[in-house]
Amino acid sequence: MPLPLVAIVGRPNVGKSTLVNRMAGVRSAIVHDEPGVTRDRLYQEVEWNGRRLRVVDTGGLVFGDDSEFLPHIRQQAMAAMAEAQAVIFVVDGREGLTPADVEVADWLRKQPLPVVVAVNKCESGQMGLAQAAAFWELGLGDPIPCSGIHGNGVAELLEAVLAHLPEVTAEAAGEPDPIAVSIVGRPNVGKSSLLNRLVGSERAIVSPISGTTRDAIDTVVTWEGQPYRLIDTAGIRKKNRVQYGIEFFSINRAFKAIQRSDAVLLVIDALEGVTEQDQRLAGRIEEEGRACVVVVNKWDAVENKDTHTINEFTREIRDRLYFIEWAPLLFVSALTGQRTHKIFEQVNTVVAAHRKRVPTAVVNEVLQDALAWQSPPTNRQGKQGRIYYGTQVADRPPTFVLFVNDPDLFKDNYRRFLEKHFRQNLDFTGTPIRFLWRGKSERLVGRAVRKLERSLTSR
């Protein structure tokens, strides 16, 4: 059963995102003392007293002004209302009732949804009651004083809104766990357009202005029965071009989005090719051990393509992103939809590899085959490397322990050969793999292996 949805609306800078973060118990939406910080619809799950719901945070509503992003923000708020079963109307208790609040209230009265008025920034209990009383004249029911910063009144607010929603417990909401997929890249490479193409609706504001998306935005979409949590992030810039403030928080949020992803779509601009920032971002994905698909966007805009063009682009990308050469490439157009239908297929492939577990017997068969192809190196003193045994100790990413006589005997070129051999024989497309080299004498290997296997079976 899908979770009921509550839309959070109000004029700019009344603390909607702070209140949403308090309800959800996380700091997801960017919170900053600047009007218009939240531009898109941001979804989060909330659990309260065994009940579950989703809330959608929207940008600040301003009527009668069509400058900058304001029409887009109104469009996003209306889309949120179309999905929702109830509304929390957030106002500022410190400022009191304003004409802008009255405009929003007039608009809400025309909507066929129950409305709960949350009077935010009421840090004092007794004073909060007096502050909330000023909003009775809106005619939208009992205003509830609360504080997104301190948390007081939030329980009462949740109880009030849950009274308007169908009861869905944590158990009743059971469904396959969504695969978390972050969409990252430099500004203006088409991340939000790609998200909208995958979702099939204008979920995030799409604009040619660099830096339109400020938050990491989560959208859940289901494809062939599998839910995916798509995370659209602010474009990554060089540090010396980032001013401290909103964009600083957005870039930090984008890196954190990579951390909480199962797979990452690294979006490259086909017209600009791989840049230094793309390389740094790819390095971050590898460091975090995340599965990855490299999505080359704007392929429709590449002129004079022939049968060799895609191979030439592939060679250039592989040369510049050599440290994630294991990541599959997709040449797509978010604008026309060209090949975007293959993205979910590729995500499934790389996530399966990222989560793969290989039996110990198979690991050692592959090791013996590798040794038959290329013997371990010998140092200048005539001492040759020996690999006694290997076993997988973790997934996400797949991680193997190799017991050897001396790890220093195995230089980078042999380690790369071994990784390539594992990839060819065990199909680790789209995921980094790790090797932990443990020096042991042959006499002690059996004891170490038994100890390791006992620790794995006790987990």
From Swiss-Prot:
GO terms for molecular function: ATP hydrolysis activity; GTP binding; ribosome binding. GTP 1 binds at residues 10-17, 57-61, 120-123. Residues 356-441 form the KH-like domain. Residues 4-169, 179-355 form the EngA-type G domain. GTP 2 binds at residues 185-192, 232-236, 297-300. The keyword Glycoprotein does not apply. SMART domains: AAA. One of its GO terms (biological process) is ribosome biogenesis. It comes from the Bacteria. Belongs to the TRAFAC class TrmE-Era-EngA-EngB-Septin-like GTPase superfamily. EngA (Der) GTPase family. GTPase that plays an essential role in the late steps of ribosome biogenesis. Associates with the 50S ribosomal subunit. This is GTPase Der. It comes from Synechococcus sp. (strain JA-2-3B'a(2-13)). The lineage of its organism: Bacteria, Bacillati, Cyanobacteriota, Cyanophyceae, Synechococcales.
